[in-house]
């Protein structure tokens, strides 16, 4: 019986090892070639933790196995260094230096509630005002005009000094009684004037666009891009409103894993379009937004290319930006051209939208 238990333990250990090895190479495997890579990239942090637990246990019962697993951990260096930022001594200074440019990217979830006097929306606007970015990039943004009890967020942001703005216009001019949805999608708000703007389609079936704006900073031009990559839409219905999200996931495990694989394949198409477009950028560039994929994924690596990940450069820890499902989902990014110096970067952990905003200060090198 004892030997049988050892056999089962060894078998489980090697199954974990095999899964871990696959998860170590997810940045190099296109989802179009192997769709299950989407699941392995999500699993990497947890498989890494399991490996450490196995090493700790095997250290007392099987030293050879412990050494094998310890050496195997080295395979995870690339994904680990993309998942964790090791700048643990860095502290965020909310007072921006005059020589730097502050930018914020945030999936605002339609500002949650566009009714006049909405407490959550007012708190979100206060957070923006408090951090005082020069440029604000938002995703899942909706602006309404008209209606007795509705407010225009565009006008509210205008009152905070964001006089320049550009929208992706994914879905506009939708009428509901006297309410008009005039903007929907991604948006760039700026306190600095635009030199030029553009939008380009990344998904024709639902008219989803990426946008960019060229701006002068310290007399030098740069271009900032933002977009919202396809959502997984795992929990769009309300049939299970009284269940927790983990129970829903278990109940729908087959549909969930299929949706993960399918959407990650769609992301591959989207990032190829974005990459091809920004490769032609005339000026140094910044890309920020909700990419709906983790730093262990092929799509993150393809999009990042030679750009700097601001969180890895100046943040600390995991940097979760979507907090509702797993504690390891850093699915919003701020990527900067090597021409920029990343001065500081933080994820503001305020549960207002379903995403946390990223705030970054940069300067020219």
Model-predicted regions and their roles:
Residues 62-84:
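Internal/C-terminal transmembrane anchor helices
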Residues 85-217:
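Membrane-embedded segments
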Residues 102-108, 124-149, 189, 213, ...:
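Active-site beta-strand/loop signature of hydrolases that rely on acidic residues for catalysis
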Residues 6-20, 25-58, 67-68, 79, ...:
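Metal-dependent phosphoester-hydrolase catalytic domains
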Residues 1-3:
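Short, Lys/Arg-rich, polar N-terminal cytosolic tail immediately upstream
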Residues 94-104, 190-196, 206-249, 340, ...:
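Beta-strand-turn-beta hairpins that frame and shape the catalytic cleft
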Residues 109-111, 143, 172, 192-195, ...:
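Short, solvent-exposed loop/turn segments at secondary-structure junctions
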């Amino acid at each position: 019986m004892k030997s049988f238990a050892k056999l089962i333990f060894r078998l489980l250990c090697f199954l974990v090892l095999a899964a871990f090895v696959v998860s170590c190479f997810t940045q190099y495997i296109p989802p179009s070639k192997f769709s299950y890579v989407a699941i392995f990239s999500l699993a990497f942090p947890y498989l890494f933790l399991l490996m450490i637990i196995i090493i700790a246990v095997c250290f007392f019962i099987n030293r050879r196995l412990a050494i094998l697993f310890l050496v195997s951990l080295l395979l995870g260096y690339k994904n680990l260094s993309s998942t964790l930022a090791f700048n643990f001594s860095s502290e965020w200074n909310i007072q921006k230096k005059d020589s730097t440019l502050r930018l914020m990217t945030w999936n605002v979830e339609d500002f949650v509630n566009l009714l006049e006097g909405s407490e959550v929306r007012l708190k979100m606007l206060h957070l923006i005002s408090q951090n005082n970015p020069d440029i604000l990039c938002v995703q899942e943004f909706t602006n309404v005009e008209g209606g007795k009890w509705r407010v225009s967020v565009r006008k509210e942001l205008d009152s905070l000094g964001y006089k320049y703005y550009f929208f992706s216009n994914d879905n506009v001019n939708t009428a509901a009684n006297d309410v008009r949805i005039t903007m929907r999608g991604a948006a760039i708000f700026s306190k600095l004037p635009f030199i030029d703007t553009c939008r380009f389609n990344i998904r024709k079936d639902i008219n989803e666009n990426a946008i960019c704006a060229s701006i002068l900073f310290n007399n030098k031009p740069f271009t900032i891009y933002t977009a919202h990559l396809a959502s997984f839409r795992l929990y769009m219905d309300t049939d299970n409103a009284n269940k927790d999200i983990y129970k829903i996931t278990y109940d729908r495990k087959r549909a969930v894993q299929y949706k993960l694989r399918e959407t990650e394949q769609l992301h591959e198409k989207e990032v190829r379009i974005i990459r091809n477009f920004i490769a032609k950028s005339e000026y140094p560039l910044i890309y920020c937004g909700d990419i709906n994929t983790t730093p262990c994924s092929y799509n993150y690596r393809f999009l990042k290319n030679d750009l700097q990940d601001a969180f890895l450069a100046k943040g600390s820890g995991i940097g979760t930006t979507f907090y509702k499902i797993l504690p390891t989902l850093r699915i919003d990014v701020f990527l900067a051209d090597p021409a920029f110096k990343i001065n500081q970067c933080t994820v503001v952990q305020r549960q207002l939208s379903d995403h946390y905003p990223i705030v970054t200060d940069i300067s020219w090198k």
